[in-house]
Amino acid sequence: MEFNKLILTSTMAHFKSGINGKNQNTFRVPPISTIVGILKNIYGKEVKNFIFGYTCQYEDVFKDVNTIYKEVNLNITSAKGDRFQHDIAFIEYLINPTITIYTNLDVPIQINDILNLGKTNCLAKCKFEKENITLKECTGYNQWTPKNIGNGEIKRINKETIYNKNKGYYDYYTDLFRLNEEFMAKHMLEDAEEGIQLWQYKGVGDIECYQDNL
């Protein structure tokens, strides 16, 4: 079956791992929620009932040092004095990343917001191509899979992140997945002759492993 192939590139990417504000490490492979967010940005927030998979490559990892400010006294109008507290944060970035997304979405491209890879300073560009994917067992590399596939480390990651306007903060849909350096996939990218883990997005927070015929 022919899938849309989206090749996103940037000079750097940051997919925050954990909640430590001072040491902000990055996932080496973005969580599923990142890819869902990118697809909804490109094809529209209301898309559902589609299949997708993705891979991630990068050249190196770099840790930057930033000064962060927190407003602690709203009664002071001056930028000086005790209005702000500041500290340093160590932020980890993937250097020259390439994220390749495959999807069967067949709707017009919208691109509702600026494309970035995890942070607003990681601006990205996207190239659109095609790729055939078939139901054939093949070895896949460096991908998140269901926890019952492969031998990689199991972690809890976000499946989807939705901003809740009524609450004023984000709702997180999470689950346990396994990050495998190498695994046996049910589907194969015909051009690359490599395995790809496919997922089926049914609706908000409802994402399942897809292993059927295409």
Residue ranges and their predicted role:
Residues A13, N25-F27, E92:
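Flexible, active-site-adjacent loop/turn segments at secondary-structure boundaries
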Residues F3, N49-I51, N96-T98:
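Extracellular structured ligand-interaction cores
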Residues M1, A13, K40, Q85-A89:
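Residue-level detector of functional hotspots within protein domains
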Residues M1-N20:
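N-terminal, Lys/Arg- and Ser/Thr-rich interaction peptides
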Residues E59-L214:
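Internal, well-folded beta-alpha domain core
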Residues A13-H14, K45-N49, P108-I109:
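Primarily extracytoplasmic ectodomains and periplasmic/lumenal surface modules that are beta-strand-rich
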Residues I19-K80:
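Glycine/small-residue-rich interface belts in oligomeric ring/scaffold proteins
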